[in-house]
């Protein structure tokens, strides 16, 4: 990709649902993640040496322009389309994965939501932390603005863990270190793998 002199490159980890993973292993071989960190380190070394900067744990760009489907600029967001998800006021919503059902909902002026769950306070805080870690920076000021409290008070255990292992540094604004890039990549991969499992379940049952 470097020979093409492209401005942005995104490297996605394997996020297969259980059935997809089984199908891949039948066709190719057992999915082996033992060398995943080594490959990720090769990617980091290669892009950094060529002047790219990390925008997320997956996306690297040169210059100011950057497009990433996984970047979240707002704390709440609404997903549009079949199979999309939303988070609004601490509630997690899932749209129907069935195109006919989606069309039926919309034609009747109904929301296509087929499931929702109120996140616990801890889940909401940890989800916020995960998305900020993925974007490589956790701003304590924005956290106070959002949750009306100090991040070290609400997420002290999590932050001490991250700092102890050298995955983040800083005080009010925490930056993900190079050592922390791979663990953050894994955490986000597991989050989307879980979503893909939900997607597979709903599609199979035309929910």
Predicted regions and their residues:
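Residue-level detector of family-conserved "landmark" positions at structurally sensitive sites
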Residues: 11, 57, 154, 171-172
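C-terminal scaffold of the Radical SAM
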Residues: 1-149, 206
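A short, conserved structural fragment
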Residues: 163-173
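Non-catalytic, well-ordered alpha-helical scaffold segments
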Residues: 123-127, 156, 181-185
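Short, amphipathic alpha-helical interaction segments positioned at domain boundaries
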Residues: 181-207
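Long, highly charged amphipathic alpha-helices
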Residues: 42, 154-157, 186, 190
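Short, conserved phosphate/pyrophosphate- and ester-handling motifs at nucleotide-, phospho-/glycolipid
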Residues: 177
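Short amphipathic alpha-helical interaction segments
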Residues: 148-163
